[in-house]
Curated annotation (Swiss-Prot):
Region annotated Phosphate acetyltransferase, chain positions: 366-697
Catalytic activity: acetyl-CoA + phosphate = acetyl phosphate + CoA
Annotated compartments: Cytoplasm
Matches recorded under Pfam families: AAA_26, DRTGG, PTA_PTB
InterPro entries per record: DRTGG, P-Actrans_bac, P-loop_NTPase, P_AcTrfase, P_AcTrfase_dom1, P_AcTrfase_dom2, Phos_Acetyltrans/Butyryltrans, PTA_PTB
Name under which the protein is recorded: Phosphate acetyltransferase
Family matches, as NCBIfam families: PRK05632.1, PRK09653.1, pta
Subunit structure: Homohexamer.
Pathway: Metabolic intermediate biosynthesis; acetyl-CoA biosynthesis; acetyl-CoA from acetate: step 2/2
Keywords: Acyltransferase, Cytoplasm, Transferase
Organism encoding this protein: Streptomyces coelicolor (strain ATCC BAA-471 / A3(2) / M145)
Length: 697
């Protein structure tokens, strides 16, 4: 999975760009392909990204950097809710992540009042992106105690929202307080906290920025001079000695344009280095004569002299509202920022933390996006027998638009088209087949009759049977016209999977067909089996369910650690039920010694490390099981539904396993997203099939 670092904050004015630039510098030192993503953006130029692109020669298309603008995001949230907003942003993030080894995410800027809880939004986005969070806390014009409290609160906020907090950065603190704050924060948080002092040069506007903001005429000065930072403003209108005494390093001198003496005196002082200034701003739309300007240019080559029409004090009001920005046009600020970052941030420690293995946490949305991405990697054709069902049509549109797989929909073609048109659904790219009118019906009837001849099925009878959408779809899979099938939104489980048992049959290494659910909890995915097919498997069958479930888990990126569940743990229980689980566990160990398996084991000991430490200390599975095998359907079905309802888990499935080719059954209460997920899973299962990829009829 692509690594990502999410730099965010808790409010405006934290100088976060310093940290964002520093992290980018660090990443580009270690990784060849670094992408950038900004979830929400304001209208206008993005100076920081332009700096990153120029400095690090990024080839990334600027259009892919941004999730959406604030106005679009606000409208989407108002009309469809925050879940849809997050989902859309996650989609756009993954378009970037798939092309890079690591992604730097630039969090929101807390400048839009239409998102009053941006911290929670940033935390959720970070979790859904699978990103480690680097929160930045602003300390400008705050006491040491206030900064300490803000830093602790920020850590608790992001940590409490389930974020993987990489470290903390407290930025822009008063220089005189920096060491005290750093000492007081040391060892008080479970992650490093680096304290960076305020640097006036970073917040100071450049002379070029001032000229642009005031619409000033550039009378003298070159590009280097215009890039100087105006660290202070000094007003000159009195005698020259008074002005010279007031000069400070890096100041911009503001004086009426008719005071040639002050202009020459200031530039002479600059030339002598007592002190160097940023430039001179002339007011009242007056400029000294040619001779004075020639002298000025010789005294201080390159030093900017600007001219504006207004008087000094209105001009000053506008100047004090300006703040410097990091950008491609301010390379000096970039160097200052990097120097500050590298001095006060332990980059070796940060690099070690960034390079650490990705968190095992997987959110439901992350799992869903991984499914779609994996399905897209090798397109397969999935047949949907319930082509006239509204939910199936909506799911088909999603699958087609996102390029998850190729689709064939079954049913009366004109009825499908009319239903889609009524719903405003575009089925362009989908194949539509009416089994009753298909030219495949005859050959399918002959095939089915041959397969079921031992049951007395004739071609005439088979001709009627294969007009059923589920039988027709199953035969499409068997005969290579589709790679997999998904049905069940309006059909019973028996109606969906009976044709598969009769036609496709089980794999050579599978004793039975079984099922699993992917249980997507808040921070991980567990595999439950069997919760849908086998009522009371014996020890042999239970072992088969376990090994099949482990293979399915691995196929979908879940490292299999198998817990064979029972009402007792280890050797504490006895009786037929627990003996069955014990025997099945030994069969798994003998058949698949490469698998980690524990049993009999109770559910709490399987998933809770604290319980496992007491009941099965030293077990490689207890406390961290990822594949949970239930002893019977009664236990499994009730448990998955209980966890689904009480823990808010998303149950993806059932996913059938053990068939030669993939066929999956939907719940009749399946939502559109459930159908999308199941189709993606079916396509992924088909990718593992040794048979040739199916094509349209």
């Amino acid at each position: 999975m692509t690594r990502s670092v999410y730099v965010t904050g808790i409010d405006r004015g934290d100088g976060r760009q310093v940290v964002e630039l520093g992290v980018m510098e660090l990443l580009t030192r270690q990784v060849d392909r670094v992408g950038v993503f900004r979830p929400l953006v304001h209208d206008g130029p993005d100076r920081l990204f332009e700096l990153l692109r120029a400095r690090y020669r990024l080839s990334q298309d600027p259009a892919t950097v941004y999730g959406m603008d604030y106005q679009e995001a606000s409208l989407l949230q108002a009309e469809q809710g925050v879940d849809e907003l997050v989902s859309a942003l996650v989609d756009r993030f993954h378009l970037v992540a798939r092309d890079y080894d690591v992604v730097l995410v630039l969090g929101t800027d807390y400048a839009d009042t239409q998102f009053p809880d941006e911290l929670s939004l940033n935390a959720r986005l970070a979790n859904e992106f699978g990103a480690s969070v680097l929160p930045v806390v602003g300390g400008r014009k705050q006491t040491a105690d206030s900064v300490l409290a803000e830093t602790h609160n920020a850590f608790r906020a992001y940590d409490g929202l389930g974020c993987d907090v990489l470290a903390m950065v407290t930025n822009r603190v008063a220089r005189e307080d920096r060491d005290e704050i750093a000492e007081r924060l040391a060892h008080r948080l479970p992650v490093p906290c680096w304290v960076v002092p305020d640097e006036p040069a970073l917040s100071a506007p450049t002379v070029s920025q001032i000229a642009h903001a005031l619409g000033a005429e550039i009378v003298l000065g070159d590009d280097s001079g215009l890039a100087r930072d105006a660290l202070d403003f000094v007003f000159g209108g009195a005698m020259l000695p008074n002005l010279l005494a007031a000069l400070t390093p890096g100041c911009l001198v503001i004086t009426p344009g008719d005071r040639a003496d002050l202009v020459i005196g200031t530039l002479a002082a600059h030339s002598a280095g007592t002190p160097p200034i940023a430039g001179v701003l002339l007011t009242l739309n007056e400029v000294p004569g040619e001779g004075i300007l020639t002298l000025a240019a010789r005294l201080a080559p390159g030093t900017p002299v600007l001219s504006v029409t207004g008087t000094s004090f209105p001009t000053a009001e506008r100047l004090f509202s300006l703040e410097g920005k990091l950008g491609a046009a301010t390379p000096r600020k970039a160097e200052t920022a990097l120097g500050l970052f590298e001095r006060y941030v332990d980059t070796a420690e940060l690099n070690k933390r960034v390079s650490a293995p990705s968190s095992d946490r997987v959110t439901p949305m992350m799992f869903e996006h991984k499914l779609l991405e994996q399905a897209r990697s090798d397109l397969r054709r999935v047949v949907l027998p319930e082509g006239t069902e509204e939910r199936v049509l909506h799911a088909a549109e999603v699958l087609l638009r996102r390029g998850v797989c190729e689709l064939t929909l079954l049913g009366p073609v004109e009825q499908i088209r009319k239903k889609a048109a009524d719903l405003g659904i575009d089925l362009g790219g989908a194949e539509l087949i009416d089994p009753a009118a298909s030219e495949l019906r005859d050959s399918f009837a002959e095939k089915y009759a041959a397969l079921r001849a031992h049951k007395g099925v004739t071609v005439e009878l088979a001709y009627d049977v294969v007009s059923d959408v589920n039988y027709f779809g199953t035969l499409m899979v068997q005969e290579g016209f589709a790679d997999g099938m998904v049905s069940g939104s309006v059909h019973s489980t028996a109606a969906t999977i009976r044709p598969a048992f009769e036609i496709i049959k089980t794999k050579p290494d599978a004793a039975i067909v079984s099922s699993v659910f992917f249980m997507c909890l808040a921070d991980k995915v567990l595999v439950y089996g069997d919760c849908a097919v086998n009522p009371d498997p014996d020890a042999e069958q239970l072992a088969d369910i376990a090994t099949q479930s482990a293979s399915t888990a691995a196929q979908f990126g879940v490292e299999p650690r198998i817990a064979m569940l029972s009402y007792s743990t280890g050797t504490s229980g006895s009786g037929a039920d627990v003996d069955k689980v014990r025997e099945a566990t030994e069969l798994v160990r003998s058949r698949r010694p490469d698998l980690s398996v524990e049993g009999p084991i109770q559910y709490d000991a399987a998933v809770e490390p604290s319980v496992a430490a007491t009941k099965l200390p030293g077990s490689a599975v207890a406390g961290q099981a990822s594949v949970l095998i239930f002893p019977d359907l009664n236990t499994g079905n009730n448990t998955y539904k209980a966890v689904q309802r009480s823990a808010g888990a998303i149950a993806v499935g059932p996913v059938l396993q053990g068939l030669r080719k993939p066929v999956n059954d939907l719940s009749r209460g399946a939502l559109v997203q459930d159908i999308v997920n199941t189709v993606a899973i079916t396509a992924i299962q088909a990718q593992q099939s040794p048979t040739e990829k199916a094509s349209a009829q």
